[in-house]
Design a protein with these regions (language model features):
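Glycan-recognition and catalytic cores of secretory/periplasmic carbohydrate-active enzymes
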Residues: 1-176
Length: 176
């Protein structure tokens, strides 16, 4: 991991038509939730090695993540908790820079708006106006962003959302 090259984008796996897998470098501008694995690793690399190139990379992505968040507010879905925990929250924790904190809190606010009060879940893909609210296993990743937001603000909104969502995860996702 110490040889991770942060200048060439992210290596993504693609399945070809013949069933074989290939690996290609893709730019960070491609809006894919899996890129947050990469930013999370880069944040960890900076935390562990304290090499400036990792911090520069995280700061260099700020505009991309900011644009992606604010230009797609109506499209926020279950990936938001994962994406922003591994980018904005991680960057805030290692830098203390409030611009990362603000971004993470905005993502938590938008994710919290997807909370369906009656069912207790943070809806995955559907509109909250739908008669059926969906939930998938990936929704567990939303908990860390909402719990973090509560720990930062102590706001009862976040506490209510994460407690109801956690109970919904226990009720609907976890099996014996």
């Amino acid at each position: 991991l110490s040889k991770l090259d942060v200048e060439n984008g992210l290596r993504e796996t693609f399945m070809e038509d013949n069933g074989s897998y290939t690996y290609k470098m893709v730019p960070m501008e491609n809006n894919v939730w899996t890129q947050s694995f990469f930013t999370g690793i880069v944040a960890y690399m900076y935390y562990h090695y304290r090499e400036q190139k990792y911090l520069d990379f995280l700061y260099g992505l700020f505009g991309y993540y900011e644009k992606n968040l604010y230009s797609h507010l109506e499209e926020i879905d279950h990936d938001a908790g994962f994406i922003h925990s591994l980018y904005a929250v991680a960057a805030y924790k290692i830098t203390g820079d409030v611009k990362f904190q603000r971004m993470a809190l905005k993502a938590a606010d938008e994710l919290g708006k997807r909370h369906h009060y009656e069912s207790g879940v943070i809806a995955s893909f559907c509109s909250l106006k739908d008669s059926k609210i969906n939930m998938i296993a990936d929704d567990v990743m939303n908990l860390q962003l909402i719990i973090w937001a509560h720990s930062e603000t102590n706001h009862p909104f976040y506490e209510r959302v994460y407690k109801k969502h956690a109970q919904a995860v226990i009720n609907y996702i976890i099996r014996e």
